[in-house]
């Protein structure tokens, strides 16, 4: 098994945080990765920010969906990685090595799920 990670961000009307979340993904040092962004048809400029990164995305769309889990499932359908990570809009990785650390610190041959801690920085 390779260790390609498909990272999925779902978003709806969060132009304030989408760029920070996307930049967090692009700063990751792990090379075997792809990024999928599912926008629920935002009307606040979110889709325009996503378009700026379109050539760096494995897949993205901006269309009405049936909610956050429908959007996540849409992303999973387009994922080609061995692992799937959900990076919600407004969230970001603790360091530029977060994905690499997750893969390197697991027994990839036996693990079904990789998880880690989170830290709430703003309310």
Where are these regions (language model features)?
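Nucleotide-sugar donor-binding/catalytic module of glycosyltransferases
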Residues: 1-123
């Amino acid at each position: 098994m390779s260790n390609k990670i498909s990272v999925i961000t779902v978003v709806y009307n969060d132009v304030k945080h989408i760029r920070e979340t996307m930049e967090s993904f692009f700063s990751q040092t792990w090379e075997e990765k792809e990024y999928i962004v599912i926008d629920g048809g935002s009307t606040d400029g979110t889709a325009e920010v996503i378009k700026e990164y379109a050539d760096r995305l494995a897949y993205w769309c901006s269309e009405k969906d049936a909610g956050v889990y429908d959007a996540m499932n849409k992303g999973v359908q387009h994922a080609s990685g061995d692992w799937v990570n959900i990076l919600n809009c407004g969230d970001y990785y603790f360091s530029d090595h977060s994905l690499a650390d997750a893969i390197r610190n697991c027994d990839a041959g036996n693990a079904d799920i990789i998880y880690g801690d989170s830290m709430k920085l703003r309310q």
